[in-house]
C-alpha cells in the first residue's frame, strides 16, 4: 500500500483563513489521499495561509519560509506553497525572493491546488495563480468534513467597502455571494456529521445577498431563519459584520430565531465621527448606537464585542476620548484593539501621521484596560448563573477537565465525562478567571 502524503498547514489571521485552510486539507485529501501532520519536518506538502492585515505581514511570511528552506535540500519532492492575502498581494515577487517556493495561490484559487501541484511536478516550474474566479472556488471544493461539533461556513467572499486603511478588497477581490441553496446544503451536510454550531463567514457577512433558485435574493436574516430549521443545528453565529448593513431584518432575527447566539461581533473601529470619515466607514457613531439600542431592546442579554484602531492618522486626544466614551456607553465585551498599521497601497497610507508612537501605545493601553475591565465585570456577573455549554473537548491545561463555550462566547472549564464532548451541557458557573470561567455540571 502506497504511503499517504503528509500535509502541514500554518494558518495566520482571521476565521476565514481557518475555513480556507480546512478546505485546503479537504481538496488535497480528495485528490492525493493525504493526512494532516502538526510537524512540518515530516510533511510532504507545506503550506502557509497568510494574512496581510497587520504591518510587516510579508516579513513574517518570509521568516517562516526561511525555516523551511533547508528542508527542501534534504527532501527534493517537498512541495512548499504560499496562500492567502499576502500571496494575492505579492504574487510572483514571492518566487523571486524565495525561489524554492513551488506554489503561490490566492484565497479564490484553493480548489486549483491539486492541479498546480501536478503542473509543478511535471514542469519543475513554480506555479502562481492569484486570480479571482468568482464563485468557482465553491463549485469545485469537495463535500465538507466536520471536525467536532462546530464548523465555519463561508457564505460570501471579498469586500466592496474600501475602508481607507484596509487591504482586504485588494487581496480578496470584490464581494461575491454563494448561492442560497449551496450554503444550506453545506450546513445540512455538516449537521448530518454531528455539527451543532455554525459560524457563517464573510468579510462583510451581513451584506450577504445570495441568489436563490427561484430568481429571488436572500439576505443574511433569511439565510439564518432557514439554517435554524436544519435538524441538529442548535447555535448560529456570524462574522465579520459592518454597521452600515446591519439591517432591521437582521436585528429582528434576534427576536425570532433562538438559535442565533446572544453574542455579536460588530467592528466599529473608532468612536469619533471625524476619524470614521477619514477611515471611510460611511456611518456615524449615533447611527451605530441606534442600532445597538434596537438590538438590545429585542435581545437584552446580548453581549457585543468589536474591533478598534487607535492612532489612526490625525487622531487627537479629543478623538480618543470619544472612543473611550463609546466603549463605556455601549459596554463592549472582549474585543480586539490595535495601533493603526500602515498598509501600502491604501489611501490612509498617504495621510500625514505626526502622533508619536509613545502616545499611541499609551492610548492602546488605556483602551485595553477599559475593555478588559468591562469583560471582567460581565464574567463576574455570570457567576451563579446556569449556562448552556457546547462541549468542545478537554482543557488545554488538564485532560481530565472538559472545556466548552457559552452562548456569549466565554470559555468554561468543568469536570464531566468525555462522552459529553460534541454535546450541549448545562453548567453552573462557579468562578470567574481572567480568561475563562469555571463551572459545575448540573
Swiss-Prot record:
Q: What is this protein's name?
A: tRNA-2-methylthio-N(6)-dimethylallyladenosine synthase
Q: Which segments constitute the MTTase N-terminal domain?
A: 5-122
Q: Can you say where in the cell this protein is located? A: Cytoplasm
- For this protein, what does the record note about how its cofactor is bound? Binds 2 [4Fe-4S] clusters. One cluster is coordinated with 3 cysteines and an exchangeable S-adenosyl-L-methionine.
Among PROSITE patterns, the record links this protein to:
MTTASE_N, MTTASE_RADICAL, RADICAL_SAM, TRAM
**Originating gene:** miaB
Q: What is the top EC class of this enzyme, as a single word?
A: transferase
The entry sums up its family as follows: Belongs to the methylthiotransferase family. MiaB subfamily.
Superkingdom in the source lineage = Bacteria
Amino acid at each position: 500500500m502506497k504511503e499517504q502524503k503528509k500535509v502541514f498547514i500554518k494558518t495566520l489571521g482571521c476565521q476565514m483563513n481557518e475555513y480556507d485552510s480546512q478546505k485546503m486539507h479537504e481538496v488535497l485529501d480528495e485528490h492525493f489521499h493525504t493526512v494532516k501532520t502538526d510537524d512540518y519536518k515530516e510533511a510532504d506538502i507545506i503550506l502557509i495561509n497568510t494574512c496581510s492585515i497587520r504591518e510587516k505581514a510579508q516579513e513574517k511570511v518570509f521568516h517562516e519560509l526561511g525555516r523551511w528552506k533547508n528542508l527542501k535540500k534534504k527532501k527534493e519532492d517537498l512541495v512548499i506553497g504560499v496562500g492567502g492575502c499576502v500571496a494575492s498581494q505579492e504574487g510572483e515577487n514571492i518566487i523571486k525572493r524565495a525561489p524554492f517556493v513551488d506554489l503561490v495561490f490566492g484565497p479564490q484559487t484553493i480548489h486549483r491546488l491539486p492541479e498546480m501541484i501536478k503542473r509543478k511536478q511535471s514542469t519543475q516550474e513554480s506555479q502562481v495563480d492569484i486570480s479571482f474566479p468568482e464563485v468557482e472556488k465553491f463549485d469545485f471544493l469537495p463535500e465538507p468534513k466536520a471536525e467536532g461539533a462546530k464548523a465555519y461556513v463561508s457564505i460570501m467572499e471579498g469586500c466592496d467597502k474600501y475602508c481607507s486603511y484596509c487591504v482586504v478588497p485588494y487581496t480578496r477581490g470584490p464581494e461575491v455571494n454563494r448561492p442560497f441553496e449551496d450554503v444550506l446544503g453545506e450546513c445540512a451536510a455538516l449537521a448530518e456529521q454531528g455539527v451543532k454550531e455554525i459560524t457563517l463567514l464573510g468579510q462583510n457577512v451581513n451584506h450577504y445577498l445570495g441568489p436563490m433558485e427561484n430568481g429571488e435574493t436572500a439576505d443574511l436574516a433569511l439565510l439564518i431563519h432557514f439554517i435554524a430549521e436544519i435538524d441538529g443545528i442548535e447555535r448560529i453565529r456570524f462574522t465579520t459584520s459592518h454597521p452600515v448593513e446591519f439591517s432591521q431584518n437582521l436585528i429582528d432575527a434576534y427576536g425570532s430565531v433562538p438559535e442565533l447566539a446572544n453574542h455579536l461581533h460588530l467592528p466599529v473601529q473608532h468612536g469619533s465621527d471625524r476619524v470614521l470619515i477619514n477611515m471611510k466607514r460611511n456611518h456615524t457613531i449615533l447611527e451605530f448606537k441606534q442600532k445597538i439600542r434596537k438590538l438590545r431592546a429585542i435581545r437584552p442579554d446580548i453581549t457585543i464585542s468589536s474591533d478598534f484602531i487607535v492612532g489612526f492618522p490625525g487622531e487627537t486626544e479629543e478623538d480618543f476620548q470619544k472612543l473611550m466614551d463609546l466603549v463605556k456607553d455601549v459596554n463592549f465585551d472582549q474585543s480586539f484593539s490595535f495601533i493603526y498599521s500602515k498598509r501600502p497601497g491604501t489611501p490612509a497610507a498617504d495621510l500625514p501621521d505626526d502622533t508619536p508612537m509613545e502616545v499611541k501605545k499609551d492610548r492602546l493601553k488605556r483602551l485595553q484596560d477599559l475593555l478588559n475591565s468591562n469583560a471582567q465585570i460581565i464574567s463576574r456577573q455570570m457567576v451563579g448563573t446556569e449556562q448552556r455549554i457546547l462541549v468542545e473537548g478537554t482543557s488545554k491545561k488538564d485532560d481530565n477537565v472538559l472545556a466548552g463555550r457559552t452562548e456569549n462566547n466565554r470559555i468554561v472549564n468543568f469536570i464531566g465525562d468525555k462522552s459529553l464532548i460534541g454535546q450541549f451541557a448545562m453548567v453552573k458557573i462557579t468562578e470567574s478567571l481572567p480568561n475563562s470561567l469555571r463551572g459545575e455540571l448540573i
